[in-house]
C-alpha cells in the first residue's frame, strides 16, 4: 500500500526520515517488479516450470499434469514450506496459474484447475471449492521472498552495485 501521509515516528515513514538524514537513495518497485520479473522468476527458477504463458499483468499459466496430492507435495518442497493451506477442487491438475503475493482477487479471470497465490480468504476458498477450482495458498511473504535474489541477478547483468536487504516476515508459525 502506498503512503497516504508521513508520520516519521511510525513505520514505514520512520525509514524515510532515516534515509533522508543519511542521504540514502531508495528505489521502490514492488508491484511493477512483480509484474515484469518476480512471478516469472518464482515460476521458472524456483518452481521449475519452464513452459508458461503470461495471462494478464500478473498471472502466469502453466501445464502441470500431476495429481493434486503430487502437485501440493512438489510446491511445498520447492518453496521449502512445512505446512500449506489448500483447497482440493479436483483430483488431477492439468493446468495452474501463479500470482505471487496476494492475488486472490484475480481468481475467475482465467480457466485453470489450480491457482497458487497468498492471502486467500475463507469465502474465496469456499467459492473455489464449490466451483471445483483447487487453491494452493503459498503465503504472501513466502511467495515474494525471492525478490532480493532475483533483483541481485538482474542488477549483476548491468554491473550495478546495490545493497539489498531481505524482508522479515512478521508472522510466526508455531
Pin down the residues of each PLM region.
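Active-site catalytic microenvironments in core metabolic enzymes, especially phosphate/sugar-handling
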Residues: 1-174
Amino acid at each position: 500500500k502506498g503512503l497516504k501521509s508521513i508520520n516519521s515516528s511510525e513505520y514505514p515513514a520512520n525509514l524515510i526520515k532515516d534515509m533522508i538524514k543519511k542521504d540514502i537513495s531508495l528505489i521502490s518497485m514492488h508491484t511493477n517488479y512483480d509484474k515484469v520479473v518476480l512471478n516469472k522468476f518464482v515460476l521458472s527458477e524456483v518452481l521449475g516450470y519452464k513452459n508458461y504463458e503470461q495471462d494478464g499483468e500478473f498471472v502466469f499459466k502453466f501445464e502441470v499434469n500431476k495429481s493434486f496430492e503430487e502437485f501440493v507435495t512438489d510446491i511445498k518442497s520447492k518453496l521449502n514450506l512445512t505446512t500449506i493451506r489448500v483447497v482440493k477442487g479436483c483430483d488431477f491438475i492439468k493446468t495452474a496459474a501463479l500470482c505471487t503475493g496476494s492475488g486472490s482477487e484475480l481468481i475467475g479471470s482465467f480457466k485453470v484447475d489450480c491457482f497458487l497465490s497468498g492471502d486467500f480468504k475463507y469465502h474465496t476458498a469456499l467459492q473455489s471449492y464449490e466451483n471445483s477450482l483447487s487453491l494452493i495458498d503459498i503465503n504472501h511473504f513466502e511467495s515474494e521472498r525471492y525478490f532480493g535474489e532475483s533483483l541481485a541477478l538482474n542488477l549483476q547483468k548491468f554491473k550495478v552495485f546495490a545493497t539489498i536487504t531481505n524482508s522479515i516476515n512478521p508472522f510466526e508459525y508455531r
